[in-house]
Amino acid sequence: MYHVVAATINPAKIKAISQAFSDIFGAGSCHIEGVEVDSGVAAQPISNTETRTGARQRVMNARRVRPEADFWVAIEAGIEEDTAFAWMVVENQKLRGESRSASFTLPAIVMKGIHQGRELGDEMARLTGIDNIKHKGGAIGAFTAGHLTRSSVYHQALILALCPFHNDIYQRKADDEDSDLI
């Protein structure tokens, strides 16, 4: 059984990680442990680069906390201009996989709160009246009437971030002979 350390204690993120690992490696193949670690970036990252850096740094910090694990996984949500998205980073001892989630445009009223220094989850809780929305369906759930959730959107991106760990094409070197592929 794989020991997977999730660099989060957020239930929506842990659910997505658990589902993605079960889908790729089989049900019951992984034990997910959530740990609270710092991203090293702002609480609300406001660029693609800052968000990706935050995910990478969470994985690095999770590795320090649980060096004995088989996998370390981080999800960092961010905003660039008026677009929300998240970066997924998955590592084991040899490989790293990364993927960016689907993105969506935030309305001006939400961006006003972001520009005033609030995190997206806090601003959405304020506007919707849903307590702790970021641990539930998130802004995604609110805007899609529950058709999508943070977990469902993150799940898809995590499946993509896991590609290097189960697809042998990722293990091939660029200069390998590929004539047998024709």
From Swiss-Prot:
Its EC number is 3.6.1.73. Its cofactor is Mg(2+); Mn(2+). It catalyses: XTP + H2O = XDP + phosphate + H(+); ITP + H2O = IDP + phosphate + H(+). Mg(2+) binds at residues 38, 68. Keywords: Hydrolase, Magnesium, Manganese, Metal-binding, Nucleotide metabolism, Nucleotide-binding. Transmembrane segments: none annotated. It comes from the Bacteria. The keyword Disulfide bond does not apply. It is an enzyme of class 3 (hydrolase). GO terms for biological process: nucleotide metabolic process; thiamine metabolic process. GO terms for molecular function: ITPase activity; metal ion binding; nucleotide binding; ribonucleoside triphosphate phosphatase activity. Substrate binds at residues 68-69. Phosphatase that hydrolyzes non-canonical purine nucleotides such as XTP and ITP to their respective diphosphate derivatives. Probably excludes non-canonical purines from DNA/RNA precursor pool, thus preventing their incorporation into DNA/RNA and avoiding chromosomal lesions. Homodimer. Belongs to the YjjX NTPase family. This is Inosine/xanthosine triphosphatase. The lineage of its organism: Bacteria, Pseudomonadati, Pseudomonadota, Gammaproteobacteria, Enterobacterales.
